[in-house]
Amino acid sequence: MTKSLFDVLKELDSLVDFSRAKLQWDILIILATKGPSSTTEISQTINTSRKSIIDAIRKLVDKELVTKVKHDIYGLSDKGKELWNKIDSVLNIEVINGNNHKGQSKDEDILALENLSQYFYLINLSKMITINHDGLSLDKAARELGVSRQTLKYYLELFEEKKLFRVIGKRTHFKKNIYKCVLMNEGKRLLFRLPEFTKMKNNLPLKLLLRLTNSYTLEMANVKVMGFILISLPLLMYFRDQLGLIELPWLYAVIFLALLSVFAQILSR
């Protein structure tokens, strides 16, 4: 017989006290919806000190609801996933996971990618790898995506295990590791069927804009272009009588970058 709502809530409360463990619930929700995350990323997401996050995660590990995945990255354990399924039965929250795709074909299983967070990282990492043939700086990529370096490295290694990417080289540049990556055949076969990736591949203004602004994402490139324009226009107006031959090329550069940004945005839709 199906459990009543009261019985389910009572069982959940016995595992994680609703009244005293709000932070633990916040962490469980983040791990269930975003996938494995670092303590720094969790701390930034819920605006709580990292020390408090570490203490709360330690309690969740003791309760066997959370497990350490790698380095500073934590994810839901089997018991934690079971708990989340019970929450789902009460609140009807749909979280995609690997257990939901047993009857699907290999392509459908890869497309599902266990949860939406993997889809997010797959698309963004693939874009960066495709455009930046010189290599990928995890520190820079993590900063532009707003995630921790450990989290990004975890997903890069995960996709390498799934044979979607392959790291073919690694070098150090100004004390930062640059990863030379390529898409594997399985990754190409999957990604080239996605409209979002196809648009990016044919978006020449986007590729040029990212190169000129030394950016990995369109959002960061637009921020840099906007900053350049906001600084340039007042300077051009104030020093217009002193710039001489520099003024016209500078003005053309402002207009060119602005138009490039607009066309890159339009072709990305």
Swiss-Prot record:
Pfam families the UniProt entry points to: MarR
Extracellular side: 240-242
Name used for this protein in its record: HTH-type transcriptional activator ArnR
One Gene Ontology term, aspect cellular component: plasma membrane
Annotated function: Involved in regulation of archaellar gene expression. Activates flaB transcription upon nutrient starvation by acting on the flaB promoter.
Deletion consequences: Deletion results in diminished flaB expression and strongly impaired swimming motility.
Residues on Cytoplasmic side: 1-218, 264-269
Record organism: Sulfolobus acidocaldarius (strain ATCC 33909 / DSM 639 / JCM 8929 / NBRC 15157 / NCIMB 11770)
A molecular function GO annotation: DNA-binding transcription factor activity
Induction of its expression: Induced during starvation conditions. Regulated by ArnS.
Membrane spanning stretches: 219-239, 243-263
DNA-binding annotation, residue ranges on this chain: 39-62
Listed InterPro entries: HTH-type_ArnR, HTH_MarR-typ, WH-like_DNA-bd_sf, WH_DNA-bd_sf
Localization, UniProt: Cell membrane
Membrane topology recorded in Swiss-Prot or TrEMBL: Multi-pass membrane protein
Domain of life: Archaea
